[in-house]
Amino acid sequence: TLKAAYYAMIKLIDDQFGRLVQFLENTNQLENTVIIYSTDHGESLGDHGLIEKGCRFYEGLVHVPLVISWPGMVKEGLQSEALVELMDITPTLMEILRIPQPDYMQGMSLWPILTGKKSATSHKPMVRSEFFDALNQPFHTRATMLRDERYKLVVYHGIGLGELYDLELDPGEFNNFWDETGSSEIKNNMILKSFDASMMAVDLGPQCIGPM
């Protein structure tokens, strides 16, 4: 079955990851190695009538694990439900290596949280994701997701469809109130934030040094 295959894949990763850690320990490199474990997406496994990955932005697909270990440097046993993006890994490593982070990078270093210098309860006010084959339609629907600590907005661009969930009252994401009366203020505010985030991520190119 699909779930049995999924469990088998988890065991395979667990076994091979264990081999890697054991090698680092056997070669006396574990204490001087930063280990980062994550993945690019989750699996539906039947949730919302879907299997495998892709086409939607439910929590089971976009909420992925992120485990960071560095014995003696990263605070042990620390857990956080703060909003984090995988793009935060790069500035985290840059801070560890004492490399200045350019202003144009969107990621935020997790190092202050990992070392206990900052509370683990909050990191970013929102996170964003994009998918370029949403809804599995032949015309390749573009879609974006914006999620803050309470709400999740999904916009399927060009076809007038969307989703809006209150994750505090509806953590399973079953009640889409995109079209409900009274949702306009929340929806419009989040659409604006998502549009701003999209534009702020555009590469500005080299600085102009001559007259226009």
Model-derived segments and their meaning:
Residues 65, 69, 192-202:
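A short, conserved beta-to-alpha structural element at the edge of catalytic cores
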Residues 1-33, 192, 196-198:
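A long, amphipathic alpha-helix that forms part
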Residues 47, 176-179:
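Phosphate-coordinating loops and pocket residues in cytosolic domains that bind phosphorylated ligands
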